[in-house]
């Protein structure tokens, strides 16, 4: 199984907010929607792109104009297009879809159940915090979740600032039935240490 498919994007920086990439993206996503559906999967990731001096409203409009040209086909094939929320403070400077409020507005304007946001807990803790309330207020727009510890993007245990049992409970209480993917970078160097860290993370998230 695959919780999230990729490969249609150009890059994180060259995304749907820039119209000069629309023709390439439309072709790529049309092809990959077929690949994903034919393989029996459901989710396909996308990215906003960098601002490059662009204001939020222009970016929203451009994303809507481009994504509307593939969403109908995604609906027909039963594929969910998901834009990842990434922090622009540390890891992906200048990335446009760096706040829930911007991403949620994009979802509202597209008005499709086949377009949602990939809520990366690590990234959103860095850029906006208020994780649990944000999830409770906007869960209907989130189709996938990523984990990692803050700071450092390492294990999600008590070596970092987020209390994952409460966050996972909020996700579960929202009625979410999709995937939560462990995306942290283990601090251990040996394979056994990495497997141990993953098992611990799964246990932490088993509420």
Label each region the model flagged.
Residues 6-11, 50-52, 85-89, 121-123, ...:
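Active-site-proximal loop/turn and secondary-structure-junction residues that shape catalytic pockets
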Residues 1-5:
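Short, structured active-site "lid" loops
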Residues 9, 57-59, 207:
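Generic structural signal for short, solvent-exposed loop/turn connectors between secondary structure elements
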Residues 13-116, 126:
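Active-site acidic/histidine proton-transfer and metal-coordination neighborhood
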Residues 31, 40-42, 80, 97-119, ...:
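Histidine-acidic metal/acid-base catalytic patches
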């Amino acid at each position: 199984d695959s919780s999230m498919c990729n490969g249609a994007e150009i890059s994180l920086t060259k995304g749907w907010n820039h119209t000069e990439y629309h023709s390439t993206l439309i072709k790529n996503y049309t092809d990959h929607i077929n690949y994903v559906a034919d393989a029996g999967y459901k989710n396909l990731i996308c990215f906003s792109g960098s601002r490059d001096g662009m204001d939020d409203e222009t970016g929203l409009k451009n994303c809507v104009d481009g994504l509307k040209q593939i969403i109908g086909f995604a609906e027909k094939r039963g594929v969910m297009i998901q834009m990842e929320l990434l922090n622009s403070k540390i890891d992906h400077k200048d990335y446009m879809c760096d706040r829930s409020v911007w991403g949620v507005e994009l979802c509202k304007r597209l008005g499709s159940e086949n377009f949602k946001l990939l809520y990366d807990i690590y990234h959103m803790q860095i850029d906006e915090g208020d994780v649990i309330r944000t999830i409770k207020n906007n869960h209907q727009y989130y189709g996938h979740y990523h984990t990692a510890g803050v700071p450092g993007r390492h294990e999600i245990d008590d070596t970092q600032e987020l209390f994952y049992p409460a966050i996972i409970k909020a996700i579960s209480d929202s009625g979410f039935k999709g995937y939560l993917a462990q995306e942290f970078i283990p601090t251990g160097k040996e394979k056994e240490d990495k497997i141990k860290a993953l098992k611990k993370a799964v246990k932490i998230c088993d509420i």
